[in-house]
Amino acid sequence: MFWLKSGLFAVGLGMSFVYAIIPPLARDLGLSEIQASFIFSLSAVAWAMTSAPWGRASDKYGRRNIAILGYIGYSISMIILILPIYLADKNILSAAFVFPLLILGRTIYGLLGSATRPASFAYIADITPKSKRTKKFARFESNFLLGTLVGPLLGGYLYLISALAPFIFFSILGIVVAMGVFFTLENKPMKVSEIPTSKLSRLAPTVWPYLVFASVLSLCSASLLQSIGFYLTDNFNNLEDITLLISFTFVLLSISTIVSQNMFTSMFNLNNYKLLIYGCLILTISYCVMALSDSIATYFSSIILHGVGLGMVRPANSSGLSIAQQPEYQGEAAGHLGSVLPIGHILTPIVAMPLYIYNSSLLYFASGILCFILFVFIVFHPIFKYRYED
């Protein structure tokens, strides 16, 4: 378990740092907001296409082997992401190759890194009774969020030493985690008689409502993540150390999400239905405050509210999907969920960033409306109220 938790922590480190550093780097390289988003969107397409197959593969061949493959892909992608920028800066590589190579680095992450999450969460589902799964998922997810908290800070410090340093460090960390998982986690592939003869359909009544919820939430979250750097740069460029402000915003988001996840699943022990409806209402309010913010303090307050809402709905939705499935479909269910999580990053360059360019407030108001629609969807769809026993 330690190495699986460390794996999510390591992936969170790299992911949050990349989100924080790409917008200012894109500006320095002369890339537009849409080009910067496109770097992430192709990776998201690759992730969406491969997540469910990796989940099925973890059911068949074991959680450990598939998770290791994901860590290796993550490590490779971190190196490929920074290498073209470094070489172009040294006039070794033509600037014309930088954008395609950035896309390549993130695409590798999408193709292989997508194996980590379904394998890891399916392993947790394997060893956890249904009654404790929401709490367990929340605590497990907290390791990833802790990584997103530390990533911009640690990465920013290492970046002061060298542009290569944070990417090399995060890459090595991924390899170390892969080795730790290999030597400590027993691989238990299914017996031939246990392998399901049919696939778990995305359209199954116990699956599609959770996927719809995750898809809409993904669009709202991705549009925020990819616009934070640009929003602060465009609206508060009179403030000093804008890069530190961007990193601090991600830190606030991560801290509030971690605290929310552990508080509402452990201390208050709210059920999934309450977590979802309260969380959606808080997210709706956060986006409206964000759209109306005219000071950095107000914007930070909206980010904290957003983290609280995310901390409630994420573990509730993922555990709800897991609880509704039979044991032999845990990997595939986690894979289906993983396949829709990148939808936001796919659609953001097409839908969100053009809206942001037109008017950033409209983007956040639109996200608030979508979160309220999710609230209505949860209230009226019976599956979110249904309780599955162990």
Write out the residue ranges for each language-model feature.
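Helix-loop boundary and gating motifs at the non-cytosolic
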Residues: 1-44, 209, 213, 218-237
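Hydrophobic core of transmembrane alpha-helices in multi-pass small-molecule transporters
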Residues: 9, 92-115, 298-312
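Intracellular juxtamembrane helix-capping segments at the cytosolic ends
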Residues: 22, 115-128, 312-326
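Central cavity-lining transmembrane alpha-helices of secondary-active solute carriers
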Residues: 38-56, 248-260
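C-terminal ends and interior cores of transmembrane alpha-helices
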Residues: 72-95, 282-294
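Cytoplasmic helix-loop-helix junction between adjacent transmembrane helices
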Residues: 105-144
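Juxtamembrane intracellular "pre-TM" segments in multi-pass secondary transporters
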Residues: 186-213
